[in-house]
Amino acid sequence: MCGIVGYIGTEQAAPIILDGLSKLEYRGYDSAGMAIFDGEKINTRKAVGRLKVLENLTHGGENMKGTSGIGHTRWATHGAPSDINSHPHMNNAGTIAVVHNGIIENYIPLKKKMQDKGYQFVSETDTEVLAHLLDYYYKGNPLEAITKVLHRVEGSYALGIMFADQPDKIFAARKDSPLIVGKSDNGSFIASDVPAILKYTRTVYYVDNQEVVELQQGSLRFFSVDEEEIEKQPVTIDWDANAAEKAGYEHFMLKEIYEQPKTINDTISPRIKDNDIVIEELNMSDEEIKEITKIHIVALSLIHI
């Protein structure tokens, strides 16, 4: 899996993005990159290897100044691991940047059509098609361009997008690949998973399928793929950020194995009241619960209980 982190606000974006990407290393990757708007143009840095390579290249983000940006850790699907194939990808003018998780299934015919229109491709990726499609449809209205592109592509995606002439906004979109957004007093965030931004905010919104999000400093607007605005309710994350870290263990499998007693206790304890088990979310009586004959467990983890 790949990882996405985006930020727009009052703080320097690059260190925040690097920190967020470090919290997504468990997803696996072979390269990493960032795009940062410096007040005049979008600058990119990309590198094959561990995130540390990108951190060293950018001096921990200190030599990429700007308060808005998007970052990505890539696990190669279309195209070998290389600096060129790493994200972000740009349009030919360098005014639109895109990071993408997922697979664009119809990228080959789309790429041919864009090449016929004169667009120059520099990578082997399916993602670069998105940058050129956005360029083709962009007439000053980012939401319109994004939704037109989403109507044309087939497959799965989670996207982070920047336009150089929209310095106070970044955008996100999703279909079948996980994506969240969040906000704080100092800015707004995009992430593939909660741990990436939990250090900065506990107020998050889960982006649903075929939704587009416009992010500004401290504000979020949600739209359907048909450009209809959507009202969404935030979720407050109340679990400990340390649960997402390796906490000194060599790897996550060891951490999960040794944390089983605590995990069982943390799961069961809130459900015990007055020597009885209470699961209010089920909205079922004791008699109805006793009639249950089968329990199906679905889990996404190295282990499950």
Spans of model-derived segments:
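Conserved small/polar residues in nucleotide/adenosyl-binding loops
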Residues: 303-305
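Conserved short alpha-helical segments that host acidic/polar catalytic motifs at enzyme active sites
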Residues: 1-255, 259-299
